[in-house]
Amino acid sequence: MMSLNWGSPSTVMGVVLQLKMNSNRLKVLAAGSNGEFPPFLPKQVEKIKDPFARSLAKRIQRLPVQMDFPDKCIMSSCIKPVIQSKNSPLVLLHCFDSSCLEWRCSYPLLEEAGLEAWAVDILGWGFSDLVENRPPCDVASKRYHLYQFWKSYIKRPMILVGPSLGASVAIDFSVNYPEAVEKLVLINPNAYAEGTRHLAKLPKTIAYAGVSLLKSIPLRLYANAMAFNGISFFTILDWTNVGRLHCMLPWWEDSTVSFMSSGGYNVISQIKQVKHRTLIICGENDQIVSYKLVVQGNLNGRPGPGYSQLPPPAAPGEEAVLARAR
């Protein structure tokens, strides 16, 4: 069965760079942009309290990406880096049914470390404009959209970072467009899931009912509770509202049903075709994707003691782990 994991605030990458953080430094990192929220974001963004989410949300922009429409582009949402580096850029994907806001705690640290990092919303999720121009949101379309984004704006081999289902996106992309990828970083990869399986055969009425359930607060609260321990209810509730913000866009249900009905990602046969150097980070305490599944076959995992599906966010006085694939 396909494992579903919603985005969470502190995805990290491997080869450790430790950064001592005090409360003042955290406030600086969270301050970010002092501007307004982009007008295309759902109005519910105003109610979010997480300073990292608010800061990163103000930086979301839409860039035109040419698809198969001869004279039309998809305005595609992303976080564009302010840093231009000679090193390979990091391109950060997200989990199933999530957005670039998943990287809200890690992204400031990456920038502070001098890395050129793009946080890109996968087609059919995030905050792109799919009201008028919505292609099928199947695997092939998601792959082609990412390639067109890379071709238009990144233009050189990248370090592609994918957590959970994002790892399947990264594997599929690297096999089909090897010239666009230098290395892979996979975090708790959901690489052995066999797509959406029986969900792909559901009648449309039932499929839409199920998708409506996906954005419900109780279900997402439960998913966040599985991923984190020792976090207050009100913090979990705020993170839940961050994670479901993109679900408020009018095209979300159609695009998610399109993905589920297509069969989803099944990259098991592609794993052995991956030729790029790959770093895998996984949590020994993950309750969603088994560590034993991560390290089987052709995948070699680096366990993160105490990690659940994703590590908890950095807090004042603690060490933040920042992954650099070099």
Q: Where are these predicted regions, by residue range?
A:
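Catalytic active-site module of serine/aspartate enzymes centered on a nucleophile-bearing elbow/loop
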Residues: 3-4, 8, 296-326
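Active-site loop/oxyanion-hole signature of alpha/beta-hydrolase fold enzymes
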Residues: 6, 49-85, 111-162, 176-177
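Serine-hydrolase catalytic-loop signature spanning alpha/beta hydrolases and amidase-signature enzymes
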Residues: 87, 95-105, 117
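Hydrophobic, aromatic-rich cap/lid helix
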Residues: 240-267
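Short beta-strand/loop motif that positions the catalytic acidic residue
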Residues: 274-275, 280-282, 286
